[in-house]
């Protein structure tokens, strides 16, 4: 198909050559057609000619319509105008077209249909004469001239695909029917609008105009012919023109206007068409427009969107009479010196002429060449044309109108350099010609028929005028315009819609501001660098301090009115804005790199400081502009944090480092610089906070209530703006903190205030709590630090580094607790050695070994173990009661943090019950003080820490309601115990309030109910904490129901939680909470009631599941009493919820509430027994070495074999005894001959490790030790396995004696005892593996001991050694004369002699069970 279409292709220059030869003889189109078809084709090719378009040339062969007789009606206008050539159907006025073009110039891009009104005016003879002097110049195929501000959009396509060609042919076939109808309308209208021949004869080029009129009428009727078809005798063109080869490429045939000849193809779309004719012409052009997109050359610099702009959607009768009159006035007035008026009429708007000389305007080389040619060729133009001064006068206005334009110009790769006076200082801008006006098709729409678009002349093929001289530099702006030069942003604003897609990687895409100003016009570094900027059309100006108006291309570009839907327009604007933001960030990255290089130096010079200040100022402007342009983009890119890190944090740290450096010459100057930087940062973030509120239309005061969950959803921009505002406040707090540190002061009140404000804006963010914890660490308030670190971990976006901070805090607390305990011991004893002489605390082992001394300390002694108090509770109570409230509060805080340190680190949990007991004792004494040393806020912090301990210790991978870890149960038990003490205190205070109300005379009438207003102050301090804990219990019922295993506490400290709650419920029912009415629904005269504890704990993850129902009260009511009324209401609901549980804990019986909660131990036994019986049959693979040896000896072979084996056993025993005696003698000799140091073992029995014989022979004694609750019984797993084997016995042993059956029965009882105790989760009973791992249950007790060395005795001894952690720095004395002291908390209970010897050699205390019971005074 391409070959067939190629046969009908013809060049525009060939047509002009033929017409130039045949015009004097005959002007008929038939002769011209014959000559064209008979002309041979030449082989020389041009690299920049347009590829032949399928479907365009085929229309040339269609039959031509005859020229209507009325085609000369407009010739009288040509005589007066000298710039306009004949039009096809002269019925359409030109003035209206021009007027509408002017209107579109001010409002946006000119539609391509409006261009045709200007395309239809050919040039006069004077201009044609000048065009003959342009000759051909040598061009490079892909030469591209750089134009500032112009960016290639997409890669040009070389040719259309076969599918596209078929689609074009289908469209051409459809055009034929429509053009037939158009021909009829054209013929009728041309007859009706025939111009006066008398006026045509007055024009020197009248004959040519008529010929051109007829020819163009024929070709436009077809819609696609060769546009450059007419000849002019005055041009002197030779008869033969150059034919181009197959590979030649041509430019677009849809030209806007031509200056070459009256017969140019620019007259193809005349303004003289009737309304029907113009409408049909526009429809035809619209259907042909897709072919333009395929005429893209690789060497072209045109954007693909230039063709897209030429595709108008609605091409109806849009040329009003007003537009035609406006166009006629502007064009006809050019000959009478109205150029200046036209320039004034169109000033302030981007004006571009799309002639070749105007398109080359922005290139310095092109402009210089054009000015040289303008100076050297006016005479030649006159002599060649043979015209007089009248033509020269007509030519000058034409040049003035065409020579100037404003805007960003895009030159094709091989655009002709014009010889017109584009560079003339008196040339005025062409009024009707806008960016999308006459010639909006860009460089691709220019053909090769006009002299101003060609670098060569067929008459002078060897002459290259465009390359003779060097051109002067082009100016971007109009110098003759009477308005101020257009700024970079304005030019981009008028041009922006021309580039719909900005995805190219062309580095020339970003414009440069003409003149000496920089591309980024920052005002520099000064204290007040944020003045109010102008308005840009999308975002108001006051929010852009110190910035130029944003580029029109990005934020305020006029878009094509008919080519994009509103959604596409929005997306288009979004894409452009995203590109601007990315550009800003790229510039900021470059500035930050320079700033980092400056900061990396060891010393910074004064010039470096000034450069640093300038870079920081630019960074602040760039980052602030990004935040104010698109807050969502800024949040996704972390612009807020990058701003703080790059512009402030690294500079502050550098200055702080320099201030601390002793080698710095002038530290005071650096300190002053640091303070100035901090002051500047404070001003900047204050300003940014205000701009955020104004830009995104919100007020910070409306969101400072501290609510994490709001009833109405926030707007997306407000949500992101609040997050940015919170970060600004955190930065303000950091700046205030740095200022205090730089000034060597510790008043962090201002920083704390900023952090609290930030916390109120977004309570779910963990960063403000982390910063508040830092301040607490600086001021040595450890409870506040632990509280805020836990809040930062229990946030929706936690700060994970707080975990390490908590670990270090708890380690420090542990050291302080140990020091406090040691101090208490020293106060109790007169000297460190006095405690050794007490009869209860000293047990001296007497034996032959004089170098070994064991010091046994009874648990009742004050130094018995870590965390335990004296056995005399009354003395201890008296000791706590004698302390002042402040000292008692300090001691309680230390014990409380020590207990939670064990829960958090899970280290040292064996002493947790003792520490918890101490905490509860001190807390109980604290609550008795009035007023309470613990305020409302401090009490809320204590409850919050208890909630976090339960929340943090829950199983992460278990979602079953019944699964709770041991740590979680212990944490819940501690929290519930403190809650019960708190409730018990509230019950007492309520009774006091009732008595006070009865005694008051004004309340005699209402004696049954307790008024909320009569609450004592201490009760008002405690009610918020009780309410918060009840909220947590309602949100997480699985953590306390069924009730956790209670701690082993003394009777004076242990409190039944549920009985206490029942008593509290009974007294609470007498409280009248309706003293202030509460409402659920909002109203005009109501206000929302927010409790202080709810606001303080908002965003705390453990409380997010708690019910949060809004409550409203009257505006005139007392808010304090209303808050207490709400608390009482919530507590009543909570107590009723306890009665409504699936397994109720409270019940209403006999007119009062009672506790029906099950006993935790009993419930644990039931659950554990079921688990134990289920797994009992699985423990069949127990290996017991000693039992197998004894059973084989007793049950296999005859009596002779037994006697033989016993004899061997006795012989081996004698040998072992002899060896032991020998070793003892050797040891004695060695000890006598060596200077041996005495060893002291300080034994504080806490962990008791019995062996298998202990359970068989002394099970009752072990039970008594366990019931004493003073020791922890540790059972090695190998002992349990041995007991299992003994309890099951040997199935093949039918001759077992009575002793074996007795052993089997005792072993069975021992197993039952252990299972029962483990199932009840006895805190004083544990199982231990051979590797030292503690087990809370023995449901799974199989252990692989294949890799262990030694027998079962060695495994039992290894369990004891697990609790012997000797460190040389702890037991080695400073002098050689002092004995070595070892601390032991474990005691091995066994009667086995071999095991006792092994224990002694490893310095493990060992006793038999009866002796230990006697010493411990148990039973």
UniProtKB/Swiss-Prot annotation:
Where does it live in the cell? Nucleus, Nucleolus; Chromosome, Telomere; Cytoplasm, Cytosol
So what does mutating residue 1251 to N actually do?
Loss of endonuclease activity and nonsense-mediated RNA decay
Q: Where is this region: EJC-binding motif 2?
A: 133-153
Q: Which cysteines are joined by disulfide bonds?
A: none
InterPro entries given for it?
DNA/RNA-bd_Est1-type, Est1-like_N, Est1/Ebs1-like, PIN-like_dom_sf, PIN_dom, TPR-like_helical_dom_sf
One Pfam family matching this protein: EST1
Q: Which residues carry this modification: Omega-N-methylarginine?
A: 406, 433
Cellular component aspect of the GO annotation? chromosome, telomeric region; ciliary basal body; cytoplasm; cytosol; nucleolus; nucleus; plasma membrane; telomerase holoenzyme complex
Where are the annotated coiled coils located? 163-193, 567-625, 1197-1239
UniProt lists compositionally biased (Acidic residues) regions at 303-313
Where does this protein hold Mn(2+)?
1251, 1353, 1392
GO molecular-function term, one example from the UniProt record: DNA polymerase binding
Enzyme class (EC, first level): hydrolase
Any idea of its EC number? 3.1.-.-
The PINc domain extends over 1246-1397
Q: Where is the composition biased (Basic residues)?
A: 279-294
Region annotation (Interaction with telomeric DNA) maps to: 114-503
- What domain notes does the record hold? The PINc domain confers endonuclease activity and is expected to bind the catalytic metal ion.
Quaternary structure, from the entry: May form homooligomers. Associated component of the telomerase holoenzyme complex. Interacts with TERT, independently of the telomerase RNA. Interacts with SMG1, SMG5, SMG7, UPF1, UPF2, UPF3B and the PP2A catalytic subunits. Also interacts with the exon junction complex (EJC) composed at least of CASC3, EIF4A3, MAGOH and RBM8A; required for the process of nonsense-mediated mRNA decay. Interacts with DHX34; the interaction is RNA-independent.
**Main function:** Component of the telomerase ribonucleoprotein (RNP) complex that is essential for the replication of chromosome termini. May have a general role in telomere regulation. Promotes in vitro the ability of TERT to elongate telomeres. Overexpression induces telomere uncapping, chromosomal end-to-end fusions (telomeric DNA persists at the fusion points) and did not perturb TRF2 telomeric localization. Binds to the single-stranded 5'-(GTGTGG)(4)GTGT-3' telomeric DNA, but not to a telomerase RNA template component (TER).
Q: What is this protein called?
A: Telomerase-binding protein EST1A
Q: Which organism is it from?
A: Homo sapiens
